[in-house]
Swiss-Prot record:
Reaction(s) this enzyme catalyzes, per UniProt: pseudouridine(1915) in 23S rRNA + S-adenosyl-L-methionine = N(3)-methylpseudouridine(1915) in 23S rRNA + S-adenosyl-L-homocysteine + H(+)
Quaternary structure (record): Homodimer.
Species assigned in the record: Bradyrhizobium sp. (strain BTAi1 / ATCC BAA-1182)
Taxonomic lineage: Bacteria, Pseudomonadati, Pseudomonadota, Alphaproteobacteria, Hyphomicrobiales
Pfam families in the record: SPOUT_MTase
Record Gene3D superfamilies: 3.40.1280.10
Gene Ontology MF term list: rRNA (pseudouridine-N3-)-methyltransferase activity
Name of the protein in question: Ribosomal RNA large subunit methyltransferase H
Keyword Methyltransferase: yes
Function of the protein: Specifically methylates the pseudouridine at position 1915 (m3Psi1915) in 23S rRNA.
Keywords (A to Z) from UniProt: Cytoplasm, Methyltransferase, rRNA processing, S-adenosyl-L-methionine, Transferase
CDD domains in the record: RlmH-like
Superkingdom of origin organism: Bacteria
Length: 160
């Protein structure tokens, strides 16, 4: 199974990008041993439209164009579930074991995700009740994806 992250906005060079890449590399190394084919990242430019509804719509169209067929969609959204790491790992492991070709995680732009994308999602995930900048969300997501691999592998990184 491939893990895909589609993010509106680009991380500039700096500590957030370096940390995200470190978790991505760690996942790729460990994930291959667990039946994962890597972590793909697609960065999309933020819409330049004047109003929020148009920005959300344009970004949703760009996101939808990148979602592979037969994949499961996971939206990072403040209205999503506060899911613990072990439960997220178990869900990703189930999808892998069921032969799902890809789990696609989506990080929206400043205005959030379209209602259509949220409805289409198999799972909505929130990293707590706070609103986070997309740079931080990306680092948190990559860490949780790496943590998923460590949990599935029985690696001591995750100590609950």
């Amino acid at each position: 199974m491939r893990i895909v992250v589609i993010a509106v906005g680009r991380l500039k060079q700096g500590p957030e990008r370096e940390l995200a890449e470190r978790y991505r590399e760690r996942f790729d190394d460990l994930g291959r041993k667990l039946g994962f084919r890597g972590l793909d990242l697609h960065e999309l430019p933020e819409s330049r439209a004047r109003d929020a509804a148009t920005r959300i719509s344009e970004e949703a169209a760009a996101i939808a164009a990148l979602i592979p067929g037969r994949s499961v969609l996971v939206c990072l959204d403040e209205r999503g579930q506060n899911i613990d790491s072990a439960s997220l790992a178990a869900q990703i492991g189930r999808w892998r074991d069921e032969g799902v070709p890809a789990a696609v995680f989506v990080i929206g732009g400043a205005d959030g995700l379209s209602p259509e994308l949220r409805r289409r999602a198999k799972l909505g995930v929130a990293f707590g009740a706070a609103t986070w900048p997309h740079q931080i969300v990306r680092v948190l997501l990559f860490e949780q994806i790496y943590r998923t691999a460590t949990i599935l592998a029985g690696h001591p990184y995750h100590r609950a």
